[in-house]
């Protein structure tokens, strides 16, 4: 199987996001890489599902709360940017202050 660098990145994000989801379901708080992977995966899947950039930017602030991440993470993750493939092409999605 031959994968492009972008496809490899998406698989890595998926693996880390899956781990993050499992840890959340066990009541554990997410660290920095898990938090970024979780948010990035939500954007990638939302784009795949046909959501718009503005929808994802708005919804992105509701996916995680401060109680779900380790202390200091909300301050470290003040913005998440990820390129996602939409029906009309690749676009950069930026979520400002994603953890409330």
Curated annotation (Swiss-Prot):
One Gene Ontology biological process: urea catabolic process
One matching Pfam family: Urease_gamma
Keyword match ATP-binding: no
Highest taxon of source: Bacteria
Enzyme Commission (EC) number: 3.5.1.5
A single Gene Ontology CC term: cytoplasm
Any GO MF annotation of the entry: nickel cation binding
Reactions this protein catalyses: urea + 2 H2O + H(+) = hydrogencarbonate + 2 NH4(+)
Enzyme class: hydrolase
Keywords per UniProt: Cytoplasm, Hydrolase
Chief localisation class: cytoplasm
Pathways per UniProt: Nitrogen metabolism; urea degradation; CO(2) and NH(3) from urea (urease route): step 1/1
Location of the protein in the cell: Cytoplasm
Self-association state and partner proteins as the record states: Heterotrimer of UreA (gamma), UreB (beta) and UreC (alpha) subunits. Three heterotrimers associate to form the active enzyme.
Similarity field: Belongs to the urease gamma subunit family.
Name of the protein in question: Urease subunit gamma
Upper taxonomic lineage: Bacteria, Bacillati, Cyanobacteriota, Cyanophyceae, Synechococcales
């Amino acid at each position: 199987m031959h994968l492009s660098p972008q496809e490899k990145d998406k698989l890595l994000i998926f693996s880390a996001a899956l781990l993050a989801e499992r840890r959340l379901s066990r009541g554990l708080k997410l660290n920095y890489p898990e938090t970024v992977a979780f948010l990035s995966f939500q954007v990638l899947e939302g784009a795949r599902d046909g959501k718009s950039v503005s929808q994802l930017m708005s919804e992105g602030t509701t996916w995680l709360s401060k109680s779900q991440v380790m202390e200091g993470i909300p301050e470290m993750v003040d913005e998440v940017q990820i390129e996602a493939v939409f029906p009309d092409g690749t676009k950069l999605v930026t979520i400002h202050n994603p953890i409330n």
